[in-house]
UniProtKB/Swiss-Prot annotation:
Record's protein name: tRNA uridine(34) hydroxylase
GO molecular function, one term: oxidoreductase activity, acting on paired donors, with incorporation or reduction of molecular oxygen
UniProt keyword Chloroplast present: no
Species whose genome carries this gene: Erwinia tasmaniensis (strain DSM 17950 / CFBP 7177 / CIP 109463 / NCPPB 4357 / Et1/99)
EC number: 1.14.-.-
Reaction catalyzed: uridine(34) in tRNA + AH2 + O2 = 5-hydroxyuridine(34) in tRNA + A + H2O
Amino acid sequence: MPVLHNLVSNEELKARMLAETEPRTTVSFYKYFTIEDPRAFRDALYVALTRLKVFGRVYVAAEGINAQVSVPASLYEEMKATLYGFHPALDKLRMNIALDDDGKSFWVLRLKVRERIVADGITDESFDASDVGAYLKAAEVNAMLDDPEAVFVDMRNHYEYEVGHFDNALEIPADTFRDQLPMAVDMLEQDKDKKIVMYCTGGIRCEKASAWMRHNGYENVYHIEGGIIEYARRAREQGLPVRFKGKNFVFDERMGERISDDVIAHCHQCGEPCDNHVNCLNDGCHLLFIQCPACAVKFNHCCSPLCMEELALTPEEQRARRAGRENGNKIFNKSRGLLSTTMHIPSPKE
């Protein structure tokens, strides 16, 4: 059977999505369970989700499924029922509905088979991914935040942590989840007897991280059920204080969900308070960075004068300049800061 996939251009698909009048619901979900034939599972799921006009990104692996999708609001319940009945392990699957949603998060459906649904780099065959830490619900999270014996650990990337996090949460300063796992084990060694509370966007990374910590001898390990998304939703529903500050970064066109009114990040170009992530407009760069409205005008939506200069060239001149250059300009590395003098990133105090 040929691989089922979309054949329409991204430009046309995006135009179709923007022209839609029916509201869409953005939702994420994941589940660790054994899939015997990931390719067959992927193809059957592609057919089922296409019928329901679902857009988004879905990863399938032998260890489970990880998805961020949008669906017409009128078809949400049908999609949920379809997933519940698709495999016994997906019955009553937790669905994390977006908190701050304009329905324009995705415009194409992509399902990919991967080695892992989260790239963890774990090769230890004795590792048991099912031996996870204890789940924490919203009220329990708030109680832990007031517990001096609890250490909150953010298992997201730097650019996610930068725009939003729990007060005093430990950042693991690595560019990838696979690098964070061994770093977390080392960084928390002095807190091994404390309560280790791990969290991430929707739960998938912190669940595996909690199992990794237990595998490495940590006993009092917890993780927030459903991640930041589920925590904020349940806290609001139950009338509890939402203790997460700032934005929750998301991996779609929205680039973030507003959780609180706090703006804790700063423009990477002028240092003014700002938490608006953008991609550099230069096709040879597309760096993800934080840019305020004033700097967007000043730098023509680019990350640096170098990219402004390149953007002003003809398409042929741009291609010639980019020839042989590896991985774009790499002006600002996500966790290691300034890599080029072409972009000044001031501290908040400057």
